[in-house]
C-alpha cells in the first residue's frame, strides 16, 4: 500500500511497503477556515525527490558469511559488504571465523520470498524491520560440550589445554623454557596469545611465583559450559576450575574462571584468546 507519511512540518515521504519512494518538500502559504469551524493549512509543493536508485522493491539481509541466502529460491552468491564480528578481532587469523555479510537485493518488481539456511542446512528464522532482515542471534548457544560438539567439525580436548595453561601460569608445567615449549603448540605463531605466553615464560616474573606444592587431586570443581559457536571451526566457552596448592604450609586455591576462544588452523584447534570470566 502507498502511504504519505509526515516527517516534520514541511517534509513528507511517499512510502510503499515500508520503502520510501519519494521525498516531498512543501512550504506554508496560509491557514484557511472551512464552514467557520475547521481550519487547515494551505501548502505548496516546492520539490519532489525520487528515491528509486534501488528500484521499487529492495531488501537488505545481514547474516553470517557461512550461511546461504535464497531470494525467490535462487541462491545469492556474493554479499555487498562484509564486517568482522564486534570485539572478536583475535578470531580472524584465517578463514575459520565467519564475517557478518550484508546482501543488498535491488531492482525487484514485486515482493519475493527470503530464505536463509545455516551451515548445518537448517532454515533459520529472520527478524524483519521494514525492508531489512537480520537474525535474532548470529551464532549458536548451547550449554554443554556434548551439545556443542554436534556443531563442531571435530572434537577438542578443552580440559587438556585448561589444565596445562593453569600449570603454566604458576610455573608448574613440564617442558623447556618453563613449559613454553609445551604450551606453544596450542597457539598460532605470531598471535597475541603466542606472544603473551612467550613473554611470560621468558620474563623475570615467572621466577618469582610463590614456592608451593600441588595437591592430589590438583584440579577440582571443574565446570565447562556457555558455548558460543560461530562456525564449525570457531567457538568460545566458559571454563571454571580450582587448582589445589600448598603455599607456606597452608592450603590455597588458584581459581581459573575464563572464556576461551578456539579456531581451527590447518586442521588443528588453536586458542586465539582468553578473557577473564565475570
Predicted regions and their residues:
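Short, charge-rich amphipathic segments
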Residues: 88, 93-104, 110-111, 126-138, ...
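Extracellular beta-sheet/turn segments enriched in Thr/Pro/Gly and aliphatic residues
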Residues: 35-50, 124-158
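Core segments of small alpha/beta cavity-forming domains
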Residues: 1, 66, 144-218
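Exposed beta-sheet edge and beta->alpha loop/turn motif
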Residues: 2-79, 84-86, 92-100, 104-109, ...
